[in-house]
């Protein structure tokens, strides 16, 4: 059994790696991720997953429902970290799987894969608490800069964390972005990670999030038509049923963190696409209390409130 396989087994038990192992893993991951496009090509069959947010034991439920990697080909739409108790183990397991099976798992960047955001919503504090220094946070946030911004399944399904941008009409414009940087406060790269579809908006609207935009059905229709895609698949917003279609099935939100923040009471979903792009949503609940680690039984920290 290789060192990497041992580390994967260890991470599957929700046991953190040594700092030196994290550093080496991140360096290996960087070599793989640097080769990926801003619009990374993904072949079907594939299973698409939304936000995880450090909910490690719920991600284990996800793998129970969807199958283990590499048997199942996975695409994760970002927001691996923050808010949950196990951001370190969650992100490192996904990263280790990426290094071990680079063609069977695709990771794209969410708005929480950012230095600034993780200093507010938990990942920075978790790294400090678990390692006694900021080094692991630094290695991981350096990797965030290398994550792709979007994916394209069989040239037909455009997958992104947040949504669209008024600065982007074509996929080639996304391909031209220099992604290897902290998420900017505005502009195309920011919008892809922060924007949301909104029923009551026609065209573009201001986002209450303070970053990105709200966009209406006409924007989606025109983007899908211009780029010859069937629909957009995105995450970024909690939906109580785990997934939600909008604008005559032109865009779907997939949310994969059940009972979000350990209190929202929502179910989660993943989207399974077969080789002909037929869809099946698999809905699942949070992991039962007895299968969780000791940490999750503690009261929620302040930033949930």
Swiss-Prot record:
GO terms for cellular component: cytosol; nucleus; plastid stroma. The keyword RNA-binding does not apply. Binds 2 manganese ions per subunit. Mn(2+) 1 binds at residues 51, 53, 79. Ubiquitous, mostly expressed in root mersitems, flowers, and vascular tissues. Keywords: Hydrolase, Manganese, Metal-binding, Plastid, Protein phosphatase. Its cofactor is Mn(2+). InterPro entries: Calcineurin-like_PHP_ApaH, Metallo-depent_PP-like, PPA2-like, Ser/Thr-sp_prot-phosphatase. Gene3D superfamilies: 3.60.21.10. GO terms for biological process: reciprocal meiotic recombination. The active site is at 112 (proton donor). It is found in: Plastid stroma. The keyword Manganese applies. It holds the Pfam family Metallophos. It catalyses: O-phospho-L-seryl-[protein] + H2O = L-seryl-[protein] + phosphate; O-phospho-L-threonyl-[protein] + H2O = L-threonyl-[protein] + phosphate. One of its GO terms (molecular function) is protein serine/threonine phosphatase activity. Its EC number is 3.1.3.16. It comes from the Eukaryota. SUPFAM superfamilies: Metallo-dependent phosphatases. It is an enzyme of class 3 (hydrolase). Mn(2+) 2 binds at residues 79, 111, 161, 236. Belongs to the PPP phosphatase family. PP-4 (PP-X) subfamily. This is Serine/threonine-protein phosphatase PP-X isozyme 2. It comes from Arabidopsis thaliana (Mouse-ear cress). The gene is PPX2.
């Amino acid at each position: 059994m290789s060192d990497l396989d041992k580390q994967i087994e260890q991470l599957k038990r929700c046991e953190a790696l040594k700092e030196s192992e994290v550093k080496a893993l991140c360096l290996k991951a960087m070599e793989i991720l640097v080769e990926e496009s801003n619009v990374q090509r993904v072949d079907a069959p594939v299973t698409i997953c939304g936000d995880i947010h450090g909910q490690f034991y719920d991600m284990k439920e996800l793998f129970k429902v969807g199958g283990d990697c590499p048997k199942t080909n996975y695409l994760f739409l970002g927001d691996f970290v923050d808010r949950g108790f196990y951001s370190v183990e969650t992100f490192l397991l996904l990263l280790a799987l990426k290094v071990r099976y680079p063609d069977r798992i695709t990771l794209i960047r969410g708005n929480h894969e950012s230095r600034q955001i993780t200093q507010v919503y938990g990942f920075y504090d978790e790294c400090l608490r678990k390692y006694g220094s900021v080094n692991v946070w630094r290695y991981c946030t350096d990797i965030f800069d290398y994550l792709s911004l979007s994916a394209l399944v069989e040239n037909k399904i455009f997958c992104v964390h947040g949504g669209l941008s008024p600065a982007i009409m074509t996929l080639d414009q996304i391909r031209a972005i220099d992604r290897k940087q902290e998420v900017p406060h505005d502009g195309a790269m920011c919008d892809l990670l922060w924007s949301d579809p909104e029923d009551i908006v026609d065209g573009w609207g201001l986002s209450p999030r303070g970053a990105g935009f709200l966009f209406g059905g006409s924007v989606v229709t025109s983007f899908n038509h211009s780029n010859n895609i069937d629909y957009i698949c995105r995450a970024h917003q909690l939906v109580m049923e785990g997934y939600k279609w909008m604008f005559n099935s032109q865009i779907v939100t997939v949310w994969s963190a059940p009972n979000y923040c350990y209190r929202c009471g929502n179910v989660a979903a993943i989207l399974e696409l077969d080789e002909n792009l037929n869809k099946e949503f698999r809905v699942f609940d949070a992991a039962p209390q007895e299968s969780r680690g000791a940490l999750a039984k503690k009261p929620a920290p302040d930033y949930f409130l």
